[in-house]
Amino acid sequence: MKVAPLSVVTLEYTVTDEHGEVIDTTVGKEPLVYLHGTRYLVSGLEAELEGRSVGEAFDVTLTPEQAYGQYDENLVQEVPGELFDGMEVSEGDTFVAETDDGHRPVTVIEVSEEFVKVDGNHPLAGVTLGFKVEIKDVRAATAEELAHGHVHGAGGCGHDHGHDHDHDHGHEHGGYCGGGHHGHDHGHDHGDDHGHGGCCGGGGCGAKGHQH
């Protein structure tokens, strides 16, 4: 069976940045399992996987446009600290903010007495990414998986989208990083929920969660 829309695909991968530094890998961990064609992965990686078969391995370099877009200075904004309702806020914290375009993940990059500066760019915006991928399994999705829009079972990318190794430290990264008015969402977390599948998993370096 080939990789096709609504097939369940199991991947092993390693992701590197422009300098060859490893950003994330599943080697030695659980592989990534996801429902293909649901925009879970960034567009460039999903396009490369389309039509491939179990056992195929490949390397691909994705431009920012194929991954998380170019870095947009307009997505860096100062918001009044009072919007956080007295919550303790530190640099590196990530919040799901309410904007004119809906809920958007933002990362705190600076805290002053009156303002909090947040960055709505994905942490990998503007970065060219190298993927080394091997397809371990491809199967048809179950009726339940199709109904829910995600994979069930071990390694699945369904309920726990905290695969962001990354850079969001287990906060609720999901959705486009937009501008507009930044409110706040109390789903803020200081824990490190890296999980497996950081780069290809929800919001991580292959995920479509922050896709531009």
Swiss-Prot record:
Name of one Pfam family that matches: FKBP_C
Family of the protein in this entry: Belongs to the FKBP-type PPIase family.
Domain commentary: The N-terminal region consists of two globular folded domains that contain prolyl isomerase and chaperone activities.
Chief location bin: cytoplasm
Task performed by this protein: Folding helper with both chaperone and peptidyl-prolyl cis-trans isomerase (PPIase) activities. Chaperone activity prevents aggregation of unfolded or partially folded proteins and promotes their correct folding. PPIases catalyze the cis-trans isomerization of Xaa-Pro bonds of peptides, which accelerates slow steps of protein folding and thus shortens the lifetime of intermediates. Both strategies lower the concentration of intermediates and increase the productivity and yield of the folding reaction. Also involved in hydrogenase metallocenter assembly, probably by participating in the nickel insertion step. This function in hydrogenase biosynthesis requires chaperone activity and the presence of the metal-binding domain, but not PPIase activity.
EC id: 5.2.1.8
Record organism: Aeromonas hydrophila
Protein name: FKBP-type peptidyl-prolyl cis-trans isomerase SlyD
Region of interest: PPIase first part: 1-69
Record keyword Repeat present: no
Gene: slyD
Catalytic activity: [protein]-peptidylproline (omega=180) = [protein]-peptidylproline (omega=0)
Entry's Gene Ontology cellular component terms: cytoplasm
GO BP terms, alphabetized: protein refolding
Domain named PPIase FKBP-type: residues: 1-94
PANTHER family given in the database record: FKBP-TYPE PEPTIDYL-PROLYL CIS-TRANS ISOMERASE SLYD
Keyword Chaperone: yes
Annotated segments matching region IF-chaperone: 76-119
Region described as PPIase second part: 128-150
Entry's Gene Ontology molecular function annotations: metal ion binding; peptidyl-prolyl cis-trans isomerase activity
Subcellular location: Cytoplasm
Superkingdom: Bacteria
Keywords annotated in UniProt: Chaperone, Cytoplasm, Isomerase, Metal-binding, Nickel, Rotamase
